[in-house]
């Protein structure tokens, strides 16, 4: 097992990819109402600012700004996963091995998640663009504006993006692989 060390910064800005255990499932969209409830509950107990989010059937991308006095993004991800898992019908629960059972896991999520500490404005811009273009990359829609499960529409209303953004994407964005 690799010796991976995460970078923790109070008030840090992070990009995450969080993935279902079974990538063939569509539970994040099928149970979007349950996911939204789990997300709100997580924010109530472990606040953070959602800079950008895109929810796909089997994984999600999230850019999170932590509070100034807090660097514990791992706890927030853990609580979000748990809150969502508990809301799913029992038939969604995965195959249990002894290790997962001891940890109280329900077999919904991959244990780990991908995390990237965002270093500057240019890095942030690339991550946001990647997140919003992801449904097109995965062939769920042909235009970014057609994907309902992202904060893209909020950012259009705020004037950060034109609603037609992503109709003709830069080759740089389409080559990024952050899944």
Please report, for each region that a protein language model flagged, where it lies by residue:
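Short catalytic/metal-binding and nucleic-acid-binding patches
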Residues: 1-179
């Amino acid at each position: 097992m690799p010796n991976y060390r995460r970078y923790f910064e109070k008030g840090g800005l992070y990009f995450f990819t969080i993935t279902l255990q079974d990538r063939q499932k569509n539970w994040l969209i099928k149970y979007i109402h349950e996911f939204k409830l789990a997300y709100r509950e997580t924010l109530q107990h472990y606040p953070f600012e959602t800079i950008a989010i895109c929810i796909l059937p089997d994984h999600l991308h999230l850019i999170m700004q932590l509070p100034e006095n807090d660097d514990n993004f791992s706890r927030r991800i853990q609580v979000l996963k748990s809150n969502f898992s508990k809301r799913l019908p029992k038939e969604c629960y995965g195959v249990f091995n002894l290790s997962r059972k001891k940890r109280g896991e329900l077999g919904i999520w991959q244990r780990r998640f991908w995390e990237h500490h965002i270093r500057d404005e240019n890095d942030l811009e690339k991550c946001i663009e990647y997140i919003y273009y992801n449904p097109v990359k995965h062939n769920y829609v042909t235009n970014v504006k057609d994907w309902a499960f992202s904060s893209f529409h909020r950012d259009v209303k705020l004037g950060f993006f034109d609603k037609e953004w992503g109709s003709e994407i830069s080759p740089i964005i389409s080559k990024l692989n952050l899944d």
